[in-house]
Every structure is written in structure tokens, then in C-alpha cells.
Amino acid sequence: MEKKKIGLLVMAYGTPYKEEDIEPYYTHIRHGRKPDPEALQDLKERYEAIGGISPLAKITEEQTKALEKKLNANQDQYEFKAYIGLKHIHPFIEDTVEEMAKDGIKEAISLVLAPHYSTFSVKSYNKRANETAEKYGIQLDSVEDWYTEPGFIKFWADGIKATYAEMTEEERNNSVLIVSAHSLPEKILKDGDPYKHQLEETAKLIVEEADVKNYAVGWQSEGNTPDPWLGPDVQDLTRELYESEGYKAFIYTPVGFVADHLEVLYDNDYECKVVCDEIGASYYRPDMPNVHPEFIETLANVVMKKAKSEVR
């Protein structure tokens, strides 16, 4: 029997590929307004602090290839062809959907590399993808979230358990887990956006699976705008928890992200570590999902569930 061909649109935020991309990339994020020279220099210094340009572009490509391979190996009903579409740099979502149409794709599934749904992020990705798909006559079914997937929860719980195993007994007895995601403007909550609740649910499931005693939910990497953003920020939270509970070790799990990139390698591994050093506490962070086989298997399960429920 001939396999049914299905397009798989893997969407992500995107990241500069080289230093020259930094200005146009952030100009796109700022809706066409260039960052001022001081802000641009600050961004360049952040990238330099993590060893140059973020590894995110390469990891996104590796994740997409691994996911396509896993999907096609796991079943013989569909032939999946994966494409990458990015929000703020080429290949842009719209250009990728156009490429899918040129390749003769009639049906496709889209997946954002972010576990939690929000009107601010996942909804905007799916809107851009669906509008373009409609234009080209592609039936596109979008995955909205996957924050409670058992494999996703288990991946983080296993990493946390391994981290606790590395600690001294004193650290283990005086430690706290901080579960975080990218902060978003507080105004999203007024419209009933589920983002905050979904992160809290992820944290609860991970804590149960890993059998963690002390934990807190925090937010990170907020944008530089006048609007209030979701808090507490992970750095402030670290100080508050140290002052109120005297913890000797902090374990950071930025579960809203799926790869090593600037927000993790700088905002966690540099900024949070600086706070830990200041207060005399130990800093720990389990590995990110990247292309870990268990994580890729989880994404494949998410896509297959959507395929079985939606594909004609």
C-alpha cells in the first residue's frame, strides 16, 4: 500500500546565524524598529558571553531531521516530509509553507517547538501558518500544546533525579527546584490565556514524577517594554527563596524551552549562576531536551496523535 504523504511544519522562534544577522533579527522582533546602538551592543555581548552565536539554529535543524526520521521509522501509514518555518528570521513561516506547496504537499501538520500554548506565541505561529496554507490550498492541522505529554514530563524528571544524585547530602537537604518558562506580558491573563496555568501544571507533574520536596515556579527572559510581565523573575525568586528559606542549592529547569540557546546559556547559566555565587549557593541545571531520543520520541507521539485524529 502506498504511504500517504504528509508535510510536517516545525516552527520555532529563530535565532541569528551569524553576527551580521543580529541587527535585522532584532529589528524584525521589534516590528521594523531598529534597536538603538546601546541595546544592539548589549545583545552582541550576550552572544559573545555564550561563545559567539547561539547553537539554536543547528539544534532546531537536528531536532527536525530526527523527528522526521523517527516518525517514518515508527509507522508505515504515512510518509512525513519535515520543513522548518521560523518566526523572526529566514526561512520564515510563510516562505516555508509556499515551499511545501511547490513540493506538492496537500495535507500537513504543524508543531511549534514550545510545549505551552499562549495567544502571544503559539497562536501567532499557527495563525501565520494557517493563513498561508489556506492561500495555497493546503489542509494544515496544528498542534496547540504538549505540556503534559508523559515523555516530556519524564525527560525533565529523569534529569532532575540525576542532578540530585550529583549533590552532596547537605545540598540535597537544603535545595529547591525552580521551574520556569519565558515570561510574557501580564495583559495576556486578562483574556483568559492558559499559558501561566499550563506552566504551573507542567511543574506539578514534574515534581510528582521526580519526587521533589521544595519547588517554585518562576519566569525569565522578559522583554524590555514598559508593560508589566509575568513574575517573579527567576533571579529575584532565587534571592527571595534564599532569604526566606536559606537554601544551599538551586536547580533550574527552564521547561518552556527545548534547546540550548541564549535564554538558557546566558539568562540561566550566567545570570542565575551569578546570583547563586553572590549568595553562596550551588547552581545546577539539568540538560536541555535538544535531540535526546526520549524527547524526539515524545514529539513523534504528539504528531502521530494529531495525524490519526485529523488527517483524512
Curated annotation (Swiss-Prot):
One of its GO terms (biological process) is heme biosynthetic process. Fe-coproporphyrin III binds at Y13, R30, R46, Y47, S54, Y125. It holds the Pfam family Ferrochelatase. It is an enzyme of class 4 (lyase). Pathway: Porphyrin-containing compound metabolism; protoheme biosynthesis. Gene3D superfamilies: 3.40.50.1400. Fe(2+) binds at H182, E263. One of its GO terms (cellular component) is cytoplasm. Its main location: cytoplasm. Its EC number is 4.99.1.9. Keywords: Cytoplasm, Heme biosynthesis, Iron, Lyase, Metal-binding, Porphyrin biosynthesis. It catalyses: Fe-coproporphyrin III + 2 H(+) = coproporphyrin III + Fe(2+). GO terms for molecular function: ferrochelatase activity; metal ion binding. InterPro entries: Ferrochelatase, Ferrochelatase_AS, Ferrochelatase_C, Ferrochelatase_N. It is found in: Cytoplasm. Involved in coproporphyrin-dependent heme b biosynthesis. Catalyzes the insertion of ferrous iron into coproporphyrin III to form Fe-coproporphyrin III. Belongs to the ferrochelatase family. PANTHER family: FERROCHELATASE (PTHR11108), FERROCHELATASE, MITOCHONDRIAL (PTHR11108:SF1). This is Coproporphyrin III ferrochelatase. It comes from Oceanobacillus iheyensis (strain DSM 14371 / CIP 107618 / JCM 11309 / KCTC 3954 / HTE831). The lineage of its organism: Bacteria, Bacillati, Bacillota, Bacilli, Bacillales.
